[in-house]
Amino acid sequence: MATIILGSQWGDEGKGKLTDILCPSAEICARSAGGHNAGHSIVAQGVSYDFHLLPSGLVNPKCMNLIGSGVVFHVPSFFSELEKLEAKGLAGVRDRIFVSDRCQVNFDLHAAVDGLEEVELGERKIGTTGRGIGPSYSTKASRSGVRISEVFDEAVFERKLRQLADGYRKRFGDLLKYDVEEEIARFKEYRKLLPNYVVDAVKFIKDAQDQNRKILIEGANALMLDIDYGTYPYVTSSNPCLGGIITGLAINPRKIETIVGVVKAYTTRVGDGIFKTEDEGEIGTKLQDIGREWGVSTGRKRRCGWLDLVVVKYSAAINHYTSLNLTKLDVLDTFPTLKVAVAYKDPATGEELDFFPADLSLLERCEVVYKEFEGWNTPTTHIKKFEELPAQARQYVEFIEQYVGVKVGWIGTGPDREDMIYR
């Protein structure tokens, strides 16, 4: 049976910690979408490991790991990440990682194009990580990309990559700083190494599910960055939602047991795009400092603000969570008053929206309707039992459950793996 961990906001919710906790009981850990733009850290036996492209199930020596068909696969990052894990003493990683032969290859060409497209957009830039994720998915959708399976046919590979580079050069001219022959030469070496890792992922997952193996699926990014359901166009270029998990891994939906939505106890966002509860003053700065809000992948500081339950309720309607993992509750310990967004009010009509609209111009003009809570002003760090939380903290958690309609099954109360309440 499969357990799925999904981000319910704009990413950086703390999915990695729950993945780390659940990994020891998993036989397979898989990723379904995105690329090396994602990022989180896992602490195992006192050592911190950074993961971007690779599934974090690699910290479990008994767990096999799969990069699914929906991922855009940057080959240099794959090998460099493996090397970094080995350098930190993680044993046997090369024997426990597999890649779908249907993955699209994310070339350095795509990263070069990513930067040029952001410049082209000017003030309307998306705020991407610059890792070529969007251009990779664009070439996939236009059917001009290269699949991993095609890397092994040298003639086909070179023809398709040259065509891709020629097309971009016609568009950008001398602004495109990229040497296609250099990339082709690098892939001559990768072609020798990749066969050890590439598998038919459809058969891999089918066999695993037929044998009732325990599969843990870690979502990258989050629902509000989904290409269809997020704050378009300020989104990623894949589907980091439940639907994307099913298509990206060919998972049998009837064999999904648990879907966990990970929710930070406040809200953060990296890059541009609408963020109704953002606080650019003292509150936002305090959340940023206490929560250590800067990205693993980019180092960029995260925008911070109050918890937006309209967003969480919307994501629950799409991802159908069976439970929530509320993270970083302890970050709120010193706030005398807390706020959560429960609706958006259109000042033109007076109408209150309790569901996230597609029309961002409507959202822009809306005012946030907040519910205030009394803070608890006492440390919650390292607390392991719900009953030991201050009454105000319990009230905060219970209101989230009531509003979203999903039970909070886990509550993070600190940075360590052990700092988790189970309910």
Swiss-Prot record:
Localization per Swiss-Prot or TrEMBL: Cytoplasm
Substrates-to-products reaction catalysed: IMP + L-aspartate + GTP = N(6)-(1,2-dicarboxyethyl)-AMP + GDP + phosphate + 2 H(+)
EC identifiers of the protein: 6.3.4.4
Amino-acid positions noted as binding Mg(2+) in the UniProt annotation, renumbered to this chain: D12, G39
Keywords carried by this UniProt record: Cytoplasm, GTP-binding, Ligase, Magnesium, Metal-binding, Nucleotide-binding, Purine biosynthesis
UniProt cofactor(s): Mg(2+)
GO cellular component: cytoplasm
CDD domains (UniProt xref): AdSS
Active site: D12 (proton acceptor), H40 (proton donor)
SUPFAM superfamilies, per database record: P-loop containing nucleoside triphosphate hydrolases (SSF52540)
Pfam families linked: Adenylsucc_synt (PF00709)
Ligand binding (substrate): V296, S297, T298, G299, R300, K301, R302
Pathway(s) served: Purine metabolism; AMP biosynthesis via de novo pathway; AMP from IMP: step 1/2
GO biological process: 'de novo' AMP biosynthetic process; cellular response to cadmium ion; IMP metabolic process
Binding note for cofactor: Binds 1 Mg(2+) ion per subunit.
Main location: cytoplasm
Binding site for GTP: G39, H40, S41, R302, K328, L329, D330, G412, T413, G414
Nucleotide-binding among keywords: yes
Protein family membership: Belongs to the adenylosuccinate synthetase family.
Quaternary structure note: Homodimer.
NCBIfam families reported for this sequence: PRK01117.1, purA
Name of the molecule in the record: Adenylosuccinate synthetase
